[in-house]
Amino acid sequence: MGVISGYAGGITINPTYERVSAGDTGHAEVVKVIYDSALLSYEDLLTVFFAMHDATTLNKQGNDVGTQYRSIILYTSDAQKATAEAFIVKLDNDVATGKIVTELKPLKEFYDAEDYHQDYYENNKSVPYCEIVINPKLAALKEKFNSLVG
């Protein structure tokens, strides 16, 4: 199990952080999740995904604004697509959730982000962004999903 930071969902071949940040590649900043489906279900991943970010505001996460920050699910199978569609319908039917704006599309190509983006939190725990943004998210993740993240 693990994650790889990267870019996907756009049109530019071999995008860089600078190009993606400029908003002209069509790519979103994404994370490839590598997991064992015998230990963690795709629905579990969707539960965590929707609980840990704002899927109701278009092109914005926290103070980060732009299409590269859009909520997006890039599926790799028809089964993943169907599961994600059903999950989104269930959330849309929950009045308290708000309208889900998450983009759902097939993964065509995933591009690894630059090395300095990989394991960013582990390598930069004392950076203000990690202390102010990531630490509270990790605490919430552990509190809400301790059985999944251990």
What residue spans do the PLM features occupy?
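Flexible coil/turn and secondary-structure edge motifs
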Residues: 1-150
